[in-house]
Design a protein with these regions (language model features):
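N-terminal hydrophobic/helix-forming segments and targeting peptides
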Residues: 1-171
Length: 172
């Protein structure tokens, strides 16, 4: 954790060739895999999802950034830094927050200690049918979801009578 101007910031890294502009001013939840040491001393792994917004990457108001609508480059390490709360980062323990949130979601983790985690932020805005005639479907990651759906549909509907080669690729 780091901080600036009375805010606790989450240290993140951009994965892959990300389009960075859409991450600004979105309600972001956090999810992924958490590795814990159980009360009995067993190393365990579980999936975690905050299920609610816990972070935001704020953009500057237009009067503080007059060039915001002109061509600009975004520095991921400087500009894409999610805020998670007000306060002193020295007083906030992310692993403790994870342990408390996991325990709230599932009591079996009550005395477990978080050892490590691999988490990602995601936009919690729900998909929608949009347009005055409801002709559009809007959603984050729609390109990936549609290509997976089309590929899976092709696999399911493949005709056994004729030989064909289908390839499934996962980018997770």
């Amino acid at each position: 954790m780091k901080g600036r101007d009375g805010c606790v910031q989450l240290g993140v890294d951009v994965y892959g060739g990300a389009l960075l502009n859409p991450w600004f001013d979105r309600d972001l939840a956090i999810a992924g895999r958490v590795t814990l040491l159980s009360a009995s001393g067993e190393l365990c792994s579980t999936l975690f999802d905050s299920t609610r917004p816990v972070a935001v990457v704020p953009s500057l108001a237009i009067h503080l950034d007059r060039d915001a609508n002109k061509q600009r480059s975004i520095n991921p390490q400087k500009d894409v830094v999610p805020l998670v709360m007000l306060g002193d980062p020295q007083q906030f323990d992310f692993k403790e927050w994870l342990a408390e949130t996991l325990t709230f979601q599932d009591a079996q983790w009550q005395d477990a200690r978080v050892m490590d985690y691999e988490l990602s932020l995601y936009d919690v805005q729900a998909p929608a049918v949009a347009g005055m005639d409801e002709s559009w479907i809007t959603s984050a990651r729609l390109d990936n979801l549609l290509s997976c759906f089309a590929g899976l549909s092709a696999l399911i509907d493949a005709d056994d009578a004729e030989w064909s080669m289908l390839v499934a690729v996962s980018y997770t």
